Each structure stands twice: as structure tokens, then as C-alpha cells.
Amino acid sequence: MELLSYEKLMIGDELNKDSVKVRIVLCSNSKEGVGIMADEKSPGHQNFLSRLDAKGHVGEAYVLLEGNGEVTVFVGIGNVEEDILLVKNNARKAGASAYKCVSQFKNMEMSLTSEYMAREVVSGIMLASYKYRFLHKEKDEPSKKIAINSQSHAVKKAVVVGNAQNFARFLGDTPANLMNPTLFVEYATKYLQDKKNVTFEVFDKSFMERKSMNLLLGVSQGSAQEPKLLVARYRGKSGDAVDIALVGKGVCFDSGGISLKPSARMHRMKGDMLGAASVLSVFGLAADMGIKINMNLVIPLVENLPSGTATKPGDVHVGMNGKSVEINNTDAEGRLILADALVYAQEANPTYIVDVATLTGAMMIALGDAFIGYFTADDDLSKIIHQSGIDANDPVWRMPLSQLYLPSMKSNVADLKNAVEGGHGGSATAAIFLSEFVGKEFKWAHFDIAGVMDSNNNKGVYGDGATGCGVPVLIEMIEKLSTIIN
């Protein structure tokens, strides 16, 4: 099957002489009125806004066609004295609003008139530019070219992170019949094949059987699609010691299995591989950025479907580390494939292990789409993750990883059961289940991105479909870890 051309989603800094030049001017709101946030202010611009009675509210936008044919977009950022996370989010919304004002142009060279919140504004431009138009009969905007004209490190970083985030969104938005385990591997191969210092291999069902990855195999056995295990290595510095292993949940479609989900919104479960999409995107981005770190990537890929061969509620499978698990809910499958993948990742003896998954609906209830929930027993790692979330404008919230939850995961016929009765503490019990497959000597963190896989409160930025949230905080975390390790 021919792969879709995701490359057309990418934005760069290659300028085109025929491009429309678009300048973005941020406008703040305060008691004194609208304020222009520009390094060089024009009296004419202030008069323009005054005539329009502009307030600088978030999302407020005005377009001015200058005499030289250039376009200036004035966009509101609101009150800049608010909480820093709110201001950053408003700046991202401003970038998205600015893009939408000029999105009719096929060729644009965009620039900012101020460095204030430049990373966040450009992030908004990047995310708002994403449009999944690969399968329509009429393909709109086939030749649109956008360039961000800036020498700023913050802006350049926002562009490459935005491209990686949009790649993760593409993977998550592609229908499951076009993104099964085999096709995911083909996209991953295309994405990784030319990256410097990267090697990768793909293992099949027979390998998993030899490694006794029976939890992973148990999830996949209801589908005609064979499971895959994608393993990649990036060596950004000398030596072969592994600094960090990234593990991503790759359930390419999750029907719930025999514990079938309700049909309403089941179509969203094509995105149940966004953990895999996120770590793949971040891994490739780290290689592109040349981060001085040695990193492994482990992605288990399956479909979770009901059939005559599917795992049944009450079945018991023995994981790669020898622990037996009673499958009392086949819709709690992500933790099963992660368990074996985490055990496999430990064979390389990494210093840090980070797994990412759209794991629990309970996380949606707990944090909504405002924060990513994460779990770790390592306070130093937690501080790095928390600050990375702030710096990357991809906020996170630490959740309890406590042995107090473990008794609820005990089974009378196996070492563990895979889901708690009644769903109480669903995210925390899932995390403590995973901890049973990670050695205490490893610095481990678990990201549950289920709540942010799509967005209700930021549709002006993300639109419908996948958000790619998790990519910005992960690459920021990896950069910070590289400075500590080196």
C-alpha cells in the first residue's frame, strides 16, 4: 500500500521570493488599553488599532494591508500579568488566530515583531497550520508553502518541535485500516531511515514467542494483523551505554476486545497508538537536533479486536518477567503490551525509562485536557519533568505512584489482575501495575496522555483530531537530561 505523503505538513525556513510577507504583532490588554508588543513601534499601527477600538483580548485579530504589499496581523494576547501557563496558552492561541487570518495565502513568509512569547506564538502557527486532507477527493491547498523567517533559537526550536508534533498527529489521525502495525512500521522506517546515528529493526511474532512476551501476544491474538515490535537506537555521543529508553503504547485500534467498548466514539480508538506516535516523533527529533544522549526506542504494536481467538476475560497470561496476570478486562490492554515492552527495554540497562500511553479514561476524568498526568517515584526526575512541561508549554501534573494501590491489583488465580474492579483509582492502579514490571534500580516515569489525545478547550489551536501533546514536554525533558548526564 502506498504511504500517505505526510511531508507536506512540514514547515521550514526556506524563503520564497514570491511569498506574501506576513508580520505578526502581539497586542496586550490592560487597564491602560491595548498595548502593542513590538521591538519597533509604528504610530500608524497604534492609530489603526485605536480607530477599531481594539482591546487586545485573546483571539482578537485585525489584518492591515500595508502600502508595500506586506500584511500585518494584530492579534490579542490578553493580560500578560496572569498565571504563566495561562499567558503561554494565550500566546499559542494568538499564533493560531494570526495564522487563520492569512491562511488563504498559498505562499507565506511569516515573521514576528517581538521576541516576547515567540516560541509559544510560533507553536500556535505550527499547530493551526495542520490539516488532515489526505483522503478527500478534492485535495485543498496542495502546494501551500509557509516559512518562518527568524534567526531566534526559540523560534527555530518551535518550528522543529511543531513539525514533530504534527507528525505524531498525522499518525494518530490516520484511519486504522491505513495504520495497522505493519503500516506503522513502514511509516517509522520512512521517518527514521535517513537520520544520523540511528539504527532500527523490527521483530515479529516468532521473536515475541521466543522472548515469552505473552502479555503482548495475548492482546494481539484476536486480530488478523500480526503484532510488531519496533526497536531503534540513537547514539548521540560516544560509548554504547544507554541513557534513556522511550517506550510507547502502540494499539493501532482498540475495540476493547471481548470486553467490547460502546460503539459511540469507538472510532476515536484509531488514536490509541498516540503514545507510540509521540515517542517515535520525539526520538527522530532528538536525532535531528543532535542531542548528546544515547537513547533506545521500544514500540509494541498490536490491534485489540474480538474474535474466536481473542483473549477472554478470566484468561491468564505469563509476562516476559515471569509474573502471571489474570485478564479480567480485555479493554485494559495497553498496560499489558507496555509491561512486556518495559521488561524488554530493561535488557539494555538504561539509566532512565519513560513510557508514554493513552492508557486510561480515568485520566480524562482526573485532569481533563489541561494537563498530562505522569507518575514517578524519583523526585529529581519529577522536578525535571515538571519544569519541562512549563518551558515547553505542555503542562504536566504528578500523580500518586503508591504501593497502597497494589492490593487492589492482586488476583486469587495469578500474581496480578490487569484492572481494578469498579474502576476506582483507574490511572493510579494502572501505573502501579506497570511498576511491577520495572526494576527498582531504574529511574522510571509513566506518562498517561489519554486526557490530552484530543482537545475540547483548545479547538482554536488543534481543531478536531489528535493534538500531539506529549511531544513538546518529552523533547524538553530529553534536552534537560542530556545536560545532567553529560
From Swiss-Prot:
Subcellular location as annotated: Cytoplasm
Cited function: Presumably involved in the processing and regular turnover of intracellular proteins. Catalyzes the removal of unsubstituted N-terminal amino acids from various peptides.
A Pfam entry, by short name: Peptidase_M17_N
UniProt key word Protease: yes
Active site: residue positions: K261, R335
Top EC class, one word: hydrolase
Main localisation: cytoplasm
Cofactor remark: Binds 2 Zn(2+) ions per subunit.
GO cellular component, one term: cytoplasm
One GO BP: proteolysis
Chain sites annotated for binding Zn(2+) 2: K249, D254, D272, E333
Family from the record: Belongs to the peptidase M17 family.
Residues reported to bind Zn(2+) 1: D254, D331, E333
InterPro entries xref list: Leucine_aapep/pepB, Macro_dom-like, Peptidase_M17_C, Peptidase_M17_leu_NH2_pept, Peptidase_M17_N
Protein name: Cytosol aminopeptidase
EC number of this enzyme: 3.4.11.1, 3.4.11.5
